[in-house]
Amino acid sequence: MFRKFIFTSAAILAVLGFSACKTAAPEQTPPASVITPAEVSPDQLKKIADVYLKDILTGLETNDYKLFVKDFAREYKDTMNPEKFAPLAAGFQAKNGKLQNLKYLDCLDQGIFKSVVWKAKFTRPKAQEEALRRDGKDPAKIPVPELLVRLLLGNVNGEWKAFAIFFN
């Protein structure tokens, strides 16, 4: 019995000794994105930006956070979380209905960043139509405003990523 006690005690002390020697590895922060100037034709950039914009708009329209942030740089993904996204998407949906028309305008070279610009037209949300009717106005006779959409892109480690989107 005494031998069993000694053996068990030795085993416990050995396990404790090994676990005490183990140090927790510090959490590794991924390196910051390296944005490099990159030559790209406007046609190539437009193709990339069209896909990114479609993902972003679909994410906003359908409350799909993962689709919305899919094409953004890591730094943006680190600051935007589902809790911040929910009111952003709700606000977007309150102001804009479904995308009706999207017209590419141009690419702007802004040093290490490129801006791709479109003119967008959305359907009028139901709540806005109802508000117009309550005010005695016919929604069909009031044009839906167009928006200017600008997507800011940068080349991160050889891959184009979105850094910001602006609706004016």
Task: Give short role names for the model-derived ranges.
Residues 50-51, 66-115:
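Short solvent-exposed beta->alpha transition segments
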Residues 105-168:
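Exposed beta-sheet edge and beta->alpha loop/turn motif
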Residues 12-13:
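Repetitive helical segments and hydrophobic/amphipathic motifs
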Residues 22-62:
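Short, low-complexity N-terminal intrinsically disordered segments enriched in polar/charged residues
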